[in-house]
Regions:
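A short beta-strand-turn-helix
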Residues: 28-49, 194-203
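Beta-strand-centric surfaces of beta-sandwich/beta-rich domains
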Residues: 251-261, 290-468, 474-571
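Thiol/selenol-based redox catalytic cores and closely related redox-interacting motifs
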Residues: 112-188
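Short active-site neighborhood of thiol/selenol oxidoreductases, capturing the structured segment around
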Residues: 43-62, 166
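Structural microenvironment flanking redox-active thiols in thiol-disulfide oxidoreductases
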Residues: 62-103, 110-120
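Aromatic- and Gly/Pro-enriched helix-to-coil junctions and flexible linker segments
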Residues: 177-335, 356, 400-406, 411
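Aromatic-rich carbohydrate-binding modules that target alpha-glucans
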Residues: 581, 585-636, 642-669
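Conserved redox-active cysteine motifs that mediate thiol-disulfide chemistry
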Residues: 55-67, 214-218
């Protein structure tokens, strides 16, 4: 157990500017996670001391821990002593020890109980480093380098601030840049709460966190820390207030000016104010009797027990640092018949490093994801719920299909492995009325010039039949700036379906409309994407190259995924029925029920030269159905129903389609 801490200051100190005489500063007496006491005086024989403030659950501290370990080993040979300092009230000694062991830190990590040392130094965030020269004056404070920041993952650093400061001090030169801005997690300081705050954790804040945060911020999930109890929430309270005020959390990037979404993650103005008031009052706990019941989470699968679980056939290795290209993993489910999927869930094998997963169906004859092949099936991203389709709606996977997983990983400071899984819940085909269909707007001709800061790309999708739009998902890579989905209706109207003005590659959101939106036949869904290939984009892997379409992160994509159903489809009506004749031909019976009363209905298709030789259908009967029977050869036949001589309609009871115009298809062996 960490004992009380004494931090003795010989004098208050300030940062030394170039040319100033360093002033004596401090000594401290702090315990590490093992209970060993350390003082600054123990480094009296060292030329330089580095105090690195870290938080064991801060993602940036995780990213920089291996680098600090390397620096400590390299500069330790030259007379530089490193100390880690953890001032977070929520970080205990056992957890600090696990962090130090995981990252193989060759220096002690000291527990700054009561954040006394952090207060004296003015440390605000983690990771933040302080460099003390031989007289133990602070000659540099700030970031380690510029590779990582909030929403920034450069391939490598362009400024090596800590290294430059150490080299200058060791060479006897003034530090050229004695202070840099630190980004990262706010230190979880101990505060003195107001005795009776108007807003308390127990009565108010716990409910907000349960509704919006703890799905991810709980043990075993993607978030780097938990927010399931008061101690954790209080330790992160100032950081919570910051990310809420800045709109970074909960992650939601749709403009509020357009569209309504069932999975809108935003906090209300009342909820935001409650968090601000709570933090301003010192984060009071309140009466534990006011706490809401703890939320119940399904352990493991969050969908009903899967009928099929597909596991990646191999482990994926994730490096400790840097970035890694997309991984494409193909799985053969060995389907001998069509299956209908009513619910699906991607379960990351290692949630800490799985950035996102997109799952596609590759029907027989399709071996890659492009505008001709690859059907969207499922997705995973932090905070994205499992896909549970409405009653009567299901996704069909044809027999013989393969499953393709597109995975993106984020290194987290240590080497890791992942083997993710996909769970599928099947639906009885007899209960399926509508097939979930997928489409995409796709620009394969991207040619983003070097240095272009606002390259515009456009792509469209045309609804060839009356449809109901359910959800959309914008996808770009590191140069993506924004994407907008606009529906252009046949009557000349246009409507913004989704506007993402600030696209973030770190968050792959599926935007589910609160109600299915009708897309009349002929509606064109336009997507306009903007890209920044300039050096001003900190995530840009290489602003000097022409960027084209490609699956790897260094390349770019302009993809607008969309999920929809056909408005008049009712698979319960059934597909055409057939009977094999003695001569090898088939007698096929077609039925059709028009949406509105019709004067006439005819059967047309490849076997009638379409409108050249239409087959009149008899009807309507008492139920309003039209029917006809024709004789066809074996093979595949496309067809539609011609209503009143000028309106082509697909077969609402047949899930098989073919071609750009989604002609209904019947296969006769």
């Amino acid at each position: 157990m960490v004992a009380s801490v004494l931090v003795g200051l010989m004098s208050l100190f300030s940062l030394v500017a170039p040319g100033e005489t360093p002033r004596p500063t401090l000594d401290f007496r702090l315990q590490d996670h093992r209970g060993a006491v350390h003082t600054l005086d123990e480094a009296r024989d060292q030329k330089v001391v580095v105090l690195a403030f870290i938080g064991i659950e801060c993602p940036l501290a995780e990213s920089y821990a291996p680098r600090l370990a390397d620096f400590a080993r390299d500069f330790g040979k030259r007379g530089v002593a490193f100390y880690g300092v953890d001032s977070n009230q929520q970080d205990g000694p056992v957890a600090i020890g696990r962090f130090a062991d995981k990252h193989k830190l060759p220096f002690p990590v000291l527990k700054d109980v009561g954040n006394t040392l952090a207060d004296r130094l003015g440390a605000e965030r983690t990771p933040e480093v302080f460099v003390l020269d031989a007289s133990r004056a602070v000659v540099y404070r700030g970031r380690i380098d510029d590779q990582y920041a909030i929403g920034i993952h450069r391939p490598s650093s362009t400024k090596r601030d800590l290294v430059d400061a150490l080299e200058a001090v060791l060479a006897g030169r003034p530090v050229a840049m004695p202070k840099t801005e630190t980004v990262g997690c706010k230190i979880g300081r101990v505060t003195k709460p107001v005795e009776t705050g108007a807003v308390t954790y127990a009565r108010d804040v716990a409910r907000i966190l349960q509704s919006h945060c703890v799905t991810c911020h709980r043990p075993g999930e993607i978030a780097p820390f938990s927010l399931t109890d008061y101690r954790q929430a209080a330790g992160w309270s100032s950081m919570i207030a910051e990310v809420v005020d800045e709109g970074r959390m909960p992650p939601w990037h749709a403009s509020p000016e357009h569209g309504k979404f069932a999975n809108d993650a935003r906090l209300s103005a009342v909820e935001k104010k409650a968090i601000r008031d709570w933090v301003a009052a010192g984060s009071p706990e309140g009466n534990p009797a006011d706490l809401p019941p703890p939320p119940k989470f399904v352990e493991g699968w969050q969908i009903p027990r899967p009928d099929m679980v597909l596991e990646m056939p191999r482990d994926i290795e994730i490096p400790a640092e840097g970035s890694m290209p997309y991984e494409l993993v193909e799985i053969d489910p060995k389907l001998t018949h069509d299956v209908w999927v009513g619910a699906s869930q991607v379960r990351p094998g290692n949630p800490a490093v799985v950035h996102h997963v997109v799952v596609f169906v590759l029907p027989p004859g399709v071996d890659k994801i492009d505008e001709e092949g690859g059907d969207f099936l499922a997705a995973y991203a932090p905070g994205m719920p499992p896909r549970v389709l409405p009653e009567g709606v299901a996704k069909r996977i044809p027999a013989g299909s393969k499953i393709m997983l597109q995975l993106h990983y984020t290194p987290r400071g240590t080497k890791q492995i992942d083997r993710s899984r996909l769970g599928l819940v099947f639906t009885d085909p007899a209960k399926v009325h509508k097939e979930l269909m997928s489409g995409m707007t796709l620009n394969l001709r991207l040619q983003i010039p070097p240095g272009a800061s606002d390259y515009v790309s456009r792509a469209d999708f045309r609804f060839s039949q009356p449809s109901l739009l359910l959800s959309v998902l914008p996808h770009m890579h590191l140069r993506g700036k924004s994407m907008k989905f606009v529906a252009e209706y046949p009557d000349g109207r246009s409507e913004v379906i989704l506007d993402v003005p600030r696209y973030e590659f770190d968050w792959q959101n599926l935007y589910t409309l609160d109600q299915p939106k009708p897309m009349p036949e002929g509606t064109i869904l336009h997507t306009e994407a903007h890209f920044d290939n300039s050096s001003e984009n900190p995530n840009n892997p290489d602003p000097s190259r022409v960027v084209t379409f490609g699956e790897q992160t260094r390349d770019e994509m302009h993809v607008g995924y969309l999920n929809f159903t056909l408005a008049d489809q009712d698979l319960a009506l059934g597909a055409p029925t057939s009977k094999r004749l003695a001569n090898g031909q088939y007698e096929v019976t077609f039925q059709y029920h028009p949406e509105a009363p019709a004067k006439s209905v005819a059967l047309v298709g490849t076997f009638t030269d379409w409108k050249e030789h239409p087959v009149a259908m008899s009807g309507p009967d008492a139920q309003g159905n039209y029917a006809t029977t024709v004789t066809l050869d074996s093979g595949s036949h496309e067809y539609k129903f011609l209503v009143d001589g000028d309106s082509f309609r697909h077969d609402p009871g047949n899930p098989e389609f073919n071609g750009f115009f989604h002609n209904s298809l019947i296969r006769l062996p």
